[in-house]
Structure formats: C-alpha cells, structure tokens
Amino acid sequence: MTLALPRHTSDPASAPADRDHRPDPGRGPGPAPSRPRVLSVAGTDPTGGAGIQADLKAFCAHGAYGMAVTTALVAQNTHGVRSVHVPGPAFLRAQLDAVSDDVEVDAVKIGMVADEANARAVGEWLDDLAAARAAAGAPRPWVVLDPVMVATSGHRLLDAGAEQAVRDLAARADVVTPNLPELAVLGGLESATTWDDALRQATSYATASDAVVLLKGGHLTGRTSPDALVVPAPGPTTGRAPGAATVTTFDAERVDTPHTHGTGCSLSAALAALRPQRASWEEAAREAKEWLTGALRAGAALRVGTGRGPVDHLHRSAPVRPG
C-alpha cells in the first residue's frame, strides 16, 4: 500500500522512489558488473547469525560479491554478547582503504560502528571515496546505514558523542534502516508504541534530515509485521512542509519464531545487495522484505544454538532437507 502524504507544492506529483537525497553529479548510468561488489562495514558474530558474517550470506543470497571490513570483534552467541574488542579507527581506515584502493565498490552496508572514533573514520572514508569517484568521473557507491544503537534489552549501546556521529553518518547514507528504538534515538524522541506513531516519527525525521528511511516494525506486536519506505520530497529542507514525504508500506505476516537473531543486519545487507540490481529503492526494499520473511520461516530448521537462533539466509538457493 502506498500513502501519499502532504507534499511541498513545488514537488511533482510523483517523485521517483529512488530519489537520491544528496546532489551527486558523479552517479550515473554505466556498464554493470557481472556481480555487484558490496562491502559490509560492521562487527562480527562468531556464530554467524549477525554482523559481517550474516551480511556476507545475505549478499551471496542475492547474487552479489561480498566483502567485509571489521569495526569490532564481538564475542557473542545466540544468548547474547560476552565481550567486545574495538581495534580502533586507524586500523579501520586501513581496512577501508585496502578495499577501495583496489576494488570499485558498488554498494556499502554500514552496521555496528562501536564508538565515535570509528563512526567518524567511516564518514571521512565515505567523503574521500565520493571525491575520488567524482574526480574520476565514476559513480559513488550506494550507502545503506543500519544504525545499531540500541540492544535488544533496550540498553543504549553508544554514548552521546557516538550517537551524534551515527546521525552524521546518516547524512551520508542513501537509506537508513532503523527499528523503532533506533528511530527514537536518531530523532531524540521516545520510542513509538504504535505503527501510526512510528510512521509519524519516521516521516518527521526523513523530512527534517533529508534521509530516506526504511522503517522496521518488528518491535511491535500484532498479526502483521510492517515495514515502510519514507522518501522525503525533493528540495531544500528549509522550504519543505512538515510531513512532505511519500510513504510506501510493505506488509507481511508476523512469523511466530524465536529465531530472529540478525534480522536487522540481514535486511539492510539484502537491501544493499539488491539496489545496484534494481531500478529503485522501493523495488529493492520490497524484495528484501519478502526474502527476510522466508528466511525467518526457515530459521528453525538450521538448529544453530540454544538461544535466539539465526534466520536461514540460503532458504531459497539451498533449503534444508527434512529428515
């Protein structure tokens, strides 16, 4: 279902859903690679359900060539996090440069940044990469930010400086993929308790920040699990009417399963892998949502861990055989 919210009067009646919210003369049509080259910038999960391990599986599931840069080494399993080691921004930048100096990256998915210094390092790298691509007359990569800021328990994972650094990263992203608690932190609000409130918060944030938002409704209860793509109207934010955005809602049945570990990582990674292969963010988001719903249904068959298990990223290409 598509909802057309009030739009700025100078906006055409049907703005494209894949509108890039930042001017970028460097991006343009060109020969597509045989496989999109997609980079994950995130933390680790040694059990494979979340972080860069999950991202690489999601990239593979959508026909992309996956690469990974590690922001933090996380000792975790299906029951929770035990310890985190952050190598630091200098080594993070060395990893990022090692990739971009050699490989033309088509899309970047950013997940856990761990701290303010790392977030700033990623932002500076994105700026330098965009400048280098523009100087070469080449398009910059699509950027998807999964703002990992709140634990499942509701605990804030970042201090105030790091939260602001993530907000600054959001200004460099094409799409931000918050759940309800993360959206509240981004916007400085209380977490929404209804879908209507969440849509209002997402629309307010999108129009004020000029960010495209893929809002995830998995934290709500009910028979359905909606997501929504919120695209702000074109034009400067100072002249934009409040709520001037287009909202496209993707409904799906709520899968009754405890195997939800890494769902946010996996959805944002699928979105990053799909965007270079699809005509719009709406098309990519719809396909990513459908894939994740199937991955949730299939997760129990994996039998990985004794806690909150992972989804099955390969449920389409290599389904688990019964017996």
Residue ranges of model-derived segments:
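Short, well-structured alpha-helical segments that form the helix of a local strand-helix-strand
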Residues: 198-206, 248-250, 280-297
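Phosphate-handling active-site elements
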Residues: 63-67, 237-248, 274-288
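Conserved N-terminal subdomain of the carbohydrate kinase-like
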Residues: 3-12, 21-40, 56-152, 314-320
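Conserved phosphate/ATP/ADP-binding segment of small-molecule kinases
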Residues: 159-247
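Charged C-terminal helix
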Residues: 2-8, 12, 16, 35, ...
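Short, small-residue alpha-helix embedded
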Residues: 58, 184-185, 259-281
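Short pre-catalytic strand/loop immediately N-terminal to key active-site residues, enriched for Gly-Thr
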Residues: 41-47, 247-262
